[in-house]
Amino acid sequence: LNRFFPGNEDSNTTSRVDHRLWREIFSHSDHIIDLHSAALGRTNMPQIRVNLANRLSNRSARAFGTEVILDSEGPRGSLRRTADDAGISCITYEGGGADESDPEAIQIAMYGILNVLRSLKVIPGYPSRPRFRLLASGSVWLRSDYGGLLDVLTPAGSFIEEGELVATVTDPEYPGKSMEIRTPTQGLLICTATHPFVTTGTPIGHLLPIIKGLKTVRRRLDEEGLLVLSGADGDPPWREDDDIEDISVEGVWEGGSPDAEWGENPESAAEEEAEEADQI
């Protein structure tokens, strides 16, 4: 459904459903919060995806109250991009994985929704805020150069150092011999693969390279190096917005956009963007 908005009443079933949803519900909305888990075969640490150039969406993303915010337009046909093009505030929350119930991701989503409602004065109170925000305009996909059985050693939400071992891939034809996948830079691992079998080019993880604000981020790591997220241990306290440190994660979306399909070829994504540009 999230690749066919705003839909077409004369097209296939999925496009017709999207057309009805857009026409009857979403096009009349002022603010949209789109809740997602990761696709099959991966898991996401809680994060917000938003086009920060949209003033109202920017406000909702910050009000949601989670630490990781990815600044991107969203893929063509997604609800977020369609709403953004229509001038409607829309943010996407990603947390947890498919076919599972992640209590932490659900709790953070619940607090985030309440925060946005408070910021809009729909319900009483003030939105709770994290100690810092990572405002990312770039990331790195870690991909396997080998096919075989995958063993992920570092969970999503971990802060990892340059050269740290993230996963191994073992070819069943060569038992006892494993290929290592190490991170090219330090940063926060916001997504990892969960499927035990990979082929060449399969993404293993999604990394936010962090250079600025290292001391601030490290102070929020637990004993295992996992980022302790706002809302994970109960309703977080209210803070003045001036007390929050905004940390820029600059760069490009290396190896694919944050919203790219899990197995998408980076060249295909580039071709899609070029095709779109030609149509404008």
Language-model region placement:
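Structured catalytic-domain cores with a bias toward divalent-metal coordination
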Residues: 1-280
